[in-house]
């Protein structure tokens, strides 16, 4: 793993659907060189694949992010994202039917895992039911997260312009994101999250972030960078702005796209029933 390989991986966190041609241009590599490196990262198991993150708000659910000491493993059917951290801590994104439902689920987890170290539960969420077009695009991306617009068009029968417009809208709102599944031990890059009551003041994280969830000043930002040295600089700045910010270094992560697909299928089926 050299610096160029690490830059490839970090760039994929920021844009999991970036084409190899564009990636080669960004890194000043020939198409052949980039293709060789990309395939080697796949063959060596550094890149394990790609997955689709779908914000629960997009399928008419509420979400919260919570962290607990990892005394034991849990696998509830409402956990959509699980992140194992260096600090003997697990971070979970959970979904629910309402704010109160989420609070009940945090209480349920607390009975098994102890009191949470962090709870981020945005109150002013606005879940909604997606359009049929959005559902078709998401289903196609779940099958092939790095599918090009033309491939999605062939799969769904939708015009390429419609697909591109909807993807831009969904990605700009952090509702949908294609992410690489990286073996972080092999990759030797650093993925970290910061939770702060004043995350809005940490604009310096813009250069490394690939996911962001904010409500007013409060929020969570997730970043990827090529080295621990780079990460330490970001974390030092974060502590200077907010001494109480919570920092989590990721060692492994998983995303349950199947939960999103099931919820979207339920929405689709109910719409069909109502139309009869």
Task: List each model region and its residues.
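A compositional/biophysical signature of low hydrophobicity enriched in polar/charged and small residues
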Residues: 1-276
């Amino acid at each position: 793993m050299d610096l160029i390989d690490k830059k490839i991986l970090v760039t994929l966190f920021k844009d999991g659907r970036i084409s190899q041609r564009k990636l080669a241009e960004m890194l000043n590599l020939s198409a052949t060189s980039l293709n060789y490196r990309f395939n080697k990262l796949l063959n060596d198991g550094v890149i394990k694949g790609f997955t689709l993150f779908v914000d629960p708000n997009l399928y008419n659910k509420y979400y919260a992010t919570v962290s607990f000491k990892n005394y034991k493993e849990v696998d509830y059917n409402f956990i959509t994202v699980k992140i194992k951290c260096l600090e003997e801590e697990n971070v979970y994104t959970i979904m629910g039917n309402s704010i109160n439902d989420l609070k009940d689920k945090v209480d349920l987890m607390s009975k098994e895992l102890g009191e949470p170290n962090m709870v981020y539960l945005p109150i002013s969420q606005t879940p909604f039911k997606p359009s049929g077009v959005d559902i078709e695009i998401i289903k196609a991306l779940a099958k092939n997260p790095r599918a090009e617009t033309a491939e999605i068009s062939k799969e769904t029968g939708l015009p390429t312009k419609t697909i591109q417009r909807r993807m831009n809208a969904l990605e700009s709102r952090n509702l949908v994101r294609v992410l690489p599944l990286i073996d972080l031990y092999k990759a030797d890059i650093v993925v970290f999250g910061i939770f702060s009551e004043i995350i809005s003041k940490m604009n310096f994280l813009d250069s490394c972030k690939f996911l962001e969830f904010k409500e007013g000043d409060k929020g969570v930002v997730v970043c990827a960078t090529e080295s621990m040295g780079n990460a330490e600089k970001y974390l030092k700045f974060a502590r200077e702005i907010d001494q109480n910010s919570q920092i989590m270094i990721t060692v492994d992560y998983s995303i349950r796209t199947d939960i999103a697909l099931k919820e979207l299928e339920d929405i689709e089926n109910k719409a069909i029933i109502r139309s009869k």
